[in-house]
Amino acid sequence: MASSTSLQHFAPPARASTRREPARRRLTVMAAVTPATEAAAAGVAEERLEPRVEEREGGYWVLKEKYREGINPQEKVKLAKEPMSLVLEDGIRDLAAKSMEEIDASKVHKDDIDVRLKWLGLFHRRKHQCESLRSPSLYRSYGRFMMRLKLPNGVTTSEQTRYLASVVEGYGKDGCADVTTRQNWQIRGVTLPDVPAIMQGLDRVGLTSLQSGMDNVRNPVGNPLAGIDPHEIVDTRPYTNLLSAFVTANSRGNLAFTNLPRKWNVCVVGSHDLYEHPHINDLAYMPTIKDGRFGFNLLVGGFFSPKRCAEAVPLDAWVPSDDVIPVCKAILEAYRDLGTRGNRQKTRMMWLIDELVSFSSSSLLLPDL
């Protein structure tokens, strides 16, 4: 499925205006649009739609040489060593056998290993280490990690919760757990030597921490009252489970989507209450009926950050419920292939949508599903 067609035409169809433009304005437009300028614009658009990444041996996706100028530091870390090799090539066991001092001494630069560990859901709070010299209470954070899981729709079993509690309890005062705004678990106080055993334990109870941080698809969010909401339109749990299984290849790690330009959020809306906050998700599935068939309208591009808050926009497309995964795949491939990788403040998917809309005023062309 060619991703260049997935986001190639984001703008809705141009609508003929009944308002008559002033003569001077009409003449200016006519003079500006010539065959030469049309050809130039088409050439720019065609070049821009060339995928910027390519698949390499082992299934890893790598940024092409010609697109590496001006990339951000995180992209340089990914180029230097594939983060998922920590899992697929058992690199985490090698790291776990080293002291933090040995790990720090082996770094190419101060953030490389800390960044790559986020693909395993491990977050080392480096800034606290700098403060620890002045504040002894913060020194405990050195060598300790927060571990973020994947918990689609926020559904957890008693067995899973007991296991996480046992992990946290083992760290005494340094251990604690968070419930996140994306319906997820985070456990704190984890030390690197314990990680291989913790990951094995997660697998035994049906959990994973893979692809939960950095430039990956984050935890799929659904209705927190799924299955018991009296105003429920659709039970979101089957769909969020499907999305999580697809994104992580059933917790084995899905290399097709471990090198996105930035993080990517997805949700499935279950009721009119909009608990899932679809307006701030990169892809939101909005339940609706069309011609007697259940499916979803799509919203895309929503996010908020200190630099910009962008509300998701309607894709003006309806998909049947059977196509939830193919649509997600097509949009992720397009974002992976076409998204910019320079200024981290301008690499979320909405920036790509803005750019592609400026190239086209045609209607959306979804790939064959």
Regions found by a protein language model. Give the residues of each.
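Long, distal/terminal scaffolding or interaction modules
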Residues: 9-12
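Peripheral terminal and linker regions in Fe-S/redox and tRNA-modifying enzymes
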Residues: 4, 21-369
